[in-house]
Amino acid sequence: MKKIAILIYPEFSIQEIGDIMYLFRWHYDIKTEIIASNSDIVVSEEGVCIKPHKTVNEFVKEDYYCLILP
């Protein structure tokens, strides 16, 4: 099943990705995966720590409907 990829970066807004993840998961039944430049934990501007599912190098575009850049 294809998913939606969301690219995160240091000091991203957790609200931006949270709303997108909620929308796709509960309104369209599409799961999301978090992508980052490396596998290190990324800290949002609110101080929330997120461990990405995959790195940019592991991203395979055929596995996803799209890549969202918040």
Predicted regions and their residues:
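Extended, subdomain-level signal for the structured scaffold at the beginning of enzyme domains
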Residues: 1-70
